Amino acid sequence: MKPARLFSKCVNGTYTHTENSGDFFTERLGNTLYIYLECSHGGDDWQNNLDFPARPYRHGKSASWFAHRGFVRVWRSVEPYLEKEVADPTVRRIVTVGYSHGAALAVLCHEYVWNARPDLRERIEGYGFGCPRVFWGPRFPWLTRRWARFAVIRNKDDIVTHVPPAALGFSHVGKMIEIGEKGRYSPIDAHRPENILKELERGEE
């Protein structure tokens, strides 16, 4: 499925709502599981978005790392709802997709899948459209390889992809893919879903 189609599904999906405004839906196509995570849609989301001091985080017995505290709180609310589907042995490929606030959750979801399904590490993919920074601290190769197949999609000038500030120790993980042209949109308009979709479709022509 091409990025424009994934993004459209993410923006227009019907979501299951959990505690702390962590919203998701899943789709099974053949042996592929798609996990979609929703953007901000209320005051609780913004409280979590702005709660950005870093905190230790880890899945199970894996080595811990530091992440945006608010996003970790929301992800912990979503994780139990996905455990059964992720563990299903008939699932042979997993794709995580998120936009904005949901893209930050997709970063955490992707790492969760990497740990929960070591048999699928070469068959997991992730897409964070308009993704904020989630990771904090030194970028050790043994740690960042967890996101080797995760793509941060940035519409150039998108302000959300530049927060929290790198000066505070935050950084993106995975591969950065830039779309659009610098100066085409204001920093806020570059984050709007209709403009991201327009640039994705333009790139697929």
Language-model segments: what does each one mean?
Residues 1-97, 101-205:
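Non-catalytic, mobile gating and regulatory segments of ester bond hydrolases
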